[in-house]
Swiss-Prot record:
Transmembrane regions: 3-23, 96-116
Name recorded for this polypeptide: Uncharacterized protein MJ1280
UniProtKB keywords: Cell membrane, Membrane, Transmembrane, Transmembrane helix
Predominant localisation class: membrane
Entry GO CC: plasma membrane
Subcellular location as annotated: Cell membrane
Membrane-protein topology: Multi-pass membrane protein
Amino acid sequence: MNLILTLLIIFAIIGLLILIFGIWLIKKLLFPKKKPKPYQVRHGSSSSKRGYGSHDVYHHHYVTKDVYVHDYGDDDIYDERGKKEGDKDDSLIDKAIAFGAGAVTGYGVAEYGEEIKEEVEDIVKEGEDIIDDIVEEAEDFVEDVVDDFDNGGDDDY
């Protein structure tokens, strides 16, 4: 009976997870997030204010989840560094630089890792010795103060 009850609970939990995933998937498909509408700022030149003509420029600024978009009128999307979305050359260069830096670091760790480890161990050992010396001096000072207090001494510390 316990086995049947355990299996029933397990299948109920699995069914509940499938139901939650299905509802989430339907929500994503039927109600996708919409891009925010840009607000328009109308700029007029000083000549249009005087009545000599019209020079109207529309800029669209809006912020999406992770990209600030400035619509220059050429239907291209620019990222926060002012590069077009379709440009691949710079991203490939960035990836190559990151890969090269990782390779150099990996080579350095493989080549000099043992020496670095020994130097770090020496530094840690020196630090432990310094801490031990400080603790010993503090204990000696406390013992001197307690002994002096017990003996009725009047030394200034």
